[in-house]
């Protein structure tokens, strides 16, 4: 498989991402079920098929510089 970066074409108002230029995608899905007003709240359920080809190694030590303001 050729390692090309994924090109995100747009993000619509309901947070649907249109992905173009990807050879194969193995997504992570999220779902939340709520019944009534706070009753039977099961929280967020994560599902993953563990076949993702994404490289999760990050060689950065900090993502954002922290500055103190007075």
UniProtKB/Swiss-Prot annotation:
InterPro entries (UniProt xref): Spore_germination_GerPA
Pfam (any one): gerPA
Superkingdom assignment: Bacteria
Entry's family note: Belongs to the GerPA/GerPF family.
Name the UniProt record assigns to this protein: Spore germination protein-like protein YpzD
Phylogenetic classification of the source organism: Bacteria, Bacillati, Bacillota, Bacilli, Bacillales
Gene that produces this protein: ypzD
